[in-house]
Amino acid sequence: MNINVADLLNGNYILLLFVVLALGLCLGKLRLGSVQLGNSIGVLVVSLLLGQQHFAINTDALNLGFMLFIFCVGVEAGPNFFSIFFRDGKNYLMLALVMVGSAMLIAMVLGKVFGWDIGLTAGMLAGAMTSTPVLVGAGDTLRHFGLPSDQLAQSLDHLSLGYALTYLVGLVSLIVGARYMPKLQHQDLQTSAQQIARERGLDTDSKRKVYLPVIRAYRVGPELVAWADGKNLRELGIYRQTGCYIERIRRNGILANPDGDAVLQMGDDIALVGYPDAHARLDPSFRNGKEVFDRDLLDMRIVTEEIVVKNHNAVGRRLAQLKLTDHGCFLNRVIRSQIEMPIDDNVVLNKGDVLQVSGDARRVKTVADRIGFISIHSQVTDLLAFCAFFIVGLMIGMITFQFSSFSFGIGNAAGLLFAGIMLGFLRANHPTFGYIPQGALNMVKEFGLMVFMAGVGLSAGAGINNGLGAVGGQMLAAGLIVSLVPVVICFLFGAYVLRMNRAMLFGAMMGARTCAPAMEIISDTARSNIPALGYAGTYAIANVLLTLAGTLIVIIWPGLQ
């Protein structure tokens, strides 16, 4: 039996879609030196090649893909979006505006100089910025802009062509820039990271190991009684001196949880909780007492939970003000926008921040109730909230404004982005509402993006040869300019106008470009994860601004004719 693969694919859109995705994802795993192609560019290249052979896909699949992607981007940005606007994120907001605004302006100037249409110009901007939100925003606005069908088809083809030609240029140039730009300034990033670490009392070791606290029991001997000198536990401040705290005391056979007024006595058995290295550093006064094994004394359930910051008595306060150790809990990690932050006593907490805390289950629960809630380790997604806010986003996108003879529609991209932000924001404030496991959110976002990339590649593939011959060289040069010049402008603005610490600044610049590979290089150069503070500050707002940039460049373009 002979199987005509071409006829089989042309007759089955679903099969064609998943063949493109599978081949593209395989291609995306290839590496060019230290640079991995990535899923987006892999799927785009395969779809362009198959598009040249006149394979096509239903446009409804393409639209659903971009809608899912942009909605999930909003959900991820939601918890931190408003805090960046309304509190101490002014510098991060300004950096993101400078980065995105200068890139959009340069792209429009180059588009006019080279005589491109809006499709090539917006596609080049999206590729040079390695930003699929720009591509999604521009594509959605073009579809609702009232263009004639033939002009719309050409603009959409040019949009994906410009993105495909400049994406790798944008990615590689930014990675190279992240590696060598720090060496061109007077301050090296390692020194800058150490400086801010000294100022804030940070742990500069990005490879800091995290252990679960352990519990050990000791019998109070004469050395420890002499060391205590009659002071109660509150006056002794045992945790500050040893890194351990006393969880339980057995005295005269009676087991009790001590309060701050308790005084150690000869013959007491005490249960100390702390990290292994803290036990190893215990003062000889403790070690000279006999270590004991008491099943009841050591019977304690140590748990590690992720606590989401929500309550007003924690939001806006510094980490040190929580006094977690005073409540018998140990902080392991601080996570913001999926980025692990340095454990900094001066970090101001935002709604939606995640604190990984270890300690006795009862104590951890008490701390969680005080500052927020324990993240639900559930595999069940609140599909009702997901669908409801998705519908709201589509309805917002239908709103249009009329100015004389000119009409402007919000569009699906902006509507879904706003609805996603609201869902993410509400989720950060209400633990039982709108829960979406991070794995599920990542899967839907990635799948939506891959479907969208497959669709635009297949639709643009037929004309790629003509496009390469006509504008290929111009595109590569323009992509390099749009990729690097805004980064230089942003650096000058942050260094000499905002006077930011260099390590924080470079992290914020990579966040404004939403480029995780470049962020890894900055962290390696600084030998610290301190730049992650800056990256997390600009990342959420940059995702939103880049989507709006794709919409704005399409709206502004006709006025430049």
Swiss-Prot record:
Signal peptide: none annotated. GO terms for molecular function: monoatomic cation transmembrane transporter activity. Belongs to the AAE transporter (TC 2.A.81) family. YbjL subfamily. It is a multi-pass membrane protein. This is Putative transport protein KPN78578_08530. Keywords: Cell membrane, Membrane, Repeat, Transmembrane, Transmembrane helix, Transport. Its main location: membrane. GO terms for cellular component: plasma membrane.
